[in-house]
């Protein structure tokens, strides 16, 4: 019986030691890794803030008027890049909200509305005209740009890019950009006034 008690005591000591080491390891890893920025307004608005910033994939796309627009030309200014589609009802509802949201903010933020079905230029133009969109609408005829941003299956998706051209977060699905949380989130992320 005494031998069984000793085995049990040794086993409990080993389990306790392993548990202690595991806790210490997890705490050290948490301290060494960059933490995700806390932002109550971004959380309530539904922004997925990226744990690690990464360089926003470059693009040069034609606008509806045929002018090539290059993302790198806007470096130094935070940007919202929204992927949308003409067949997407949520996208069509979000476009006028984004347009209204942009009023008075274009000096602080760059806005890009990328139509993923850009080969349907007439349909894109019709939606833009109906909603009186003045923001740059870019035509995406190749999936390369979507793949680089990881846009698959669900639109609208809006990517938040900081002044240095780094991706800092994104939203998936329609958002109410007219909400106070939207502007509060962007002010926090991009240090805007």
For the regions a language model picked out, list residue spans one by one.
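Thiol/disulfide oxidoreductase modules built on the thioredoxin-like
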Residues: 129-134, 140-188
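Short active-site neighborhood of thiol/selenol oxidoreductases, capturing the structured segment around
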Residues: 70-92
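N-terminal Sec-pathway targeting helices
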Residues: 4-16
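Structural microenvironment flanking redox-active thiols in thiol-disulfide oxidoreductases
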Residues: 92-131, 141-148
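Active-site acidic short loop of glycosyltransferases
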Residues: 75-77, 107, 133-134
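N-proximal helix/coil linker or "cap" segments that precede and/or mark the start of modular domains
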Residues: 25-58
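Hydrophobic membrane-insertion alpha-helices, especially the h-region
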Residues: 13-25
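Hydrophobic beta-strand anchors of alpha/beta hydrolase catalytic cores
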Residues: 80-81, 111, 158
């Amino acid at each position: 019986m005494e031998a069984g008690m000793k085995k049990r005591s040794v086993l409990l000591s080993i389990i306790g030691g392993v548990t202690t080491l595991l806790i210490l390891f997890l705490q050290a890893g948490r301290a060494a890794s960059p933490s995700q920025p806390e932002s109550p307004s971004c959380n309530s608005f539904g922004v997925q803030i990226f744990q690690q910033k990464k360089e926003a994939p470059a693009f040069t796309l034609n606008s509806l008027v045929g002018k090539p627009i290059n993302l790198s030309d806007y470096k130094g200014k935070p940007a919202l890049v929204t992927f949308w589609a003409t067949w997407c009802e949520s996208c069509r509802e979000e476009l006028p909200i984004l347009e209204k949201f942009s009023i008075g903010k274009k000096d602080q933020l760059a806005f890009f509305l990328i139509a993923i079905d850009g080969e349907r230029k007439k349909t894109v133009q019709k939606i833009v005209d109906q909603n009186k969109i003045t923001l740059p609408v870019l035509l995406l005829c190749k999936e390369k740009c979507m793949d680089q941003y990881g846009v698959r299956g669900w639109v609208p998706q809006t990517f938040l890019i900081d002044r240095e051209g780094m991706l800092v977060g994104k939203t998936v699905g329609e958002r109410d950009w007219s909400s106070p949380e939207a502007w509060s989130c962007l002010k926090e992320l991009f240090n805007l006034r």
